[in-house]
Design a protein with these regions (language model features):
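Post-signal peptide N-terminal segment of secreted/secretory-pathway proteins
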Residues: 77-78, 90-94
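Long, charged/polar, surface-exposed segments that mediate recognition or autoinhibition
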Residues: 101, 261, 281
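Long amphipathic alpha-helical scaffold regions
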Residues: 97-126, 295-314, 319-323, 328
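N-terminal capping/linker segments that flank leucine-rich repeat
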Residues: 20-75, 81-84, 119, 129-253, ...
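Short beta-strand elements of solenoid repeat domains
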Residues: 70-71, 92-94, 114-116, 248, ...
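Bacterial Sec-dependent N-terminal signal peptides
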Residues: 1-28
Length: 337
């Protein structure tokens, strides 16, 4: 009987020691103080990562040792919190729903990022400094971009030039295949190409292609009445930091026209588009000299953020339009700020 009691006590003691050890191991793990995007947290939870009751990532061995994550097709709009993975080197973020992609949300040691299928991205943050001289994400050795990254003429080209020998940059084509990134862009329509080449030769590397890293030196306006539905190429001119002048582009109302990415540079004083859709919206954040805004018959336009400068300046003597802000025929417009 005495032996049985001793054996029972030994079992209880062992169980207590093991339990205490497990609790100690769990309590030893730190929690991330970085705020996680709710959808990203849900995705990571389904992948087996642990979060506290307060939504903080528990930095256990699984987190500390994770070097690769496949977060493709997860409908993510943000990766806030992902920098909590200290060993993460490779992340697949293809086919999500980003509109802004912030490289500051990635771990400092990140090496490879895949973004194919995220054609809604209009802004790339914290990849390189705003003046294009300092790379902020120096650890990258492989950057895979979505097709619509070709419209980005400030951040991506500057990063590409600065990291040519250190980072392989590729970009998806229209069919979803990755091809080597280049700063040269073709202008498909011969009539438009001829007009741009004649008025802005400083950015052409041949009669067919524009180099988006070159700065416009001509003082010409961009005024074009299109006879073709293909306006690809005007985006590279109106967003060029060297452009100074007016932009007035019109299409025939009976035809369908589209400008994929509209981001007027700081030198644009008048911006007018008529009978042209802008499926990725209009980014006027850089248009610090804008005095006149006119948008007519743009069925895809949902939001217009009007720079304060256009609301404060008196341009009654110089305006070529009846009013400083004129927006009409935009059936999808949700708000004008």
């Amino acid at each position: 009987m005495r032996n049985f009691i001793s054996f029972y006590v030994l079992i209880v003691l062992c169980f207590t020691i093991i339990s205490c050890k497990d609790e100690t191991e769990i309590s030893d793990f730190e929690v991330s103080e970085v705020t996680f995007d709710t959808k990203l947290r849900d995705v990571l939870t389904r992948k087996g990562f642990n979060f506290s009751e307060n939504g903080e990532l528990i930095c256990d061995n699984q987190v500390l040792n994770t070097t690769s994550l496949d977060l493709s097709r997860c409908e993510l709009t943000s990766i806030s919190g992902l920098r909590s993975f200290p060993s993460l080197a490779d992340v697949n973020l293809e086919c999500n729903s980003f509109s802004i992609f912030d490289f500051a949300d990635l771990p400092e040691g990140i090496k490879s990022v895949a973004l194919r299928g995220n054609d809604g991205i209009t802004s790339y943050l914290n990849l390189i400094s705003t003046d294009g001289t300092t790379v902020l994400c120096k650890s990258l050795t492989n950057l895979k971009l979505p097709y619509f990254a070709k419209w980005n003429t400030d951040v991506i080209p500057a990063f590409y030039k600065a990291m040519t020998d250190k980072c392989l940059v590729v970009m998806s084509d229209e069919d979803g295949n990755y091809t080597e990134y280049t700063v040269n862009r073709r202008v498909p329509d011969p009539l438009l190409r001829s007009y741009l080449y004649r008025n802005f030769p400083s950015v052409f590397v041949s009669s067919l292609e524009i180099d988006v890293t070159k700065r416009i030196t001509e003082g010409n306006d961009l005024i074009f009445l299109s006879q073709t539905a293909n306006l690809e190429g005007v985006e590279y001119i109106l967003s060029n930091p060297g452009f100074r002048g007016k932009v007035d582009i019109s299409g025939v109302k009976s035809k369908h026209y589209s400008m994929s990415y509209v981001k007027p540079s700081s030198g644009v004083s008048v911006f007018s588009i008529s009978n042209i859709d802008t499926p990725l919206g209009m980014d006027l954040s850089s248009a610090s000299s804008l005095k006149v805004l006119r948008v007519e018959n743009n069925s895809s336009l949902q939001l217009v953020v009007v720079p304060s400068v256009i609301l404060n300046d008196d341009v009654s003597e110089t305006s070529i339009f009846d009013s400083e802000i004129h927006i009409s025929g935009c059936s999808s417009l949700l708000a004008s700020i």
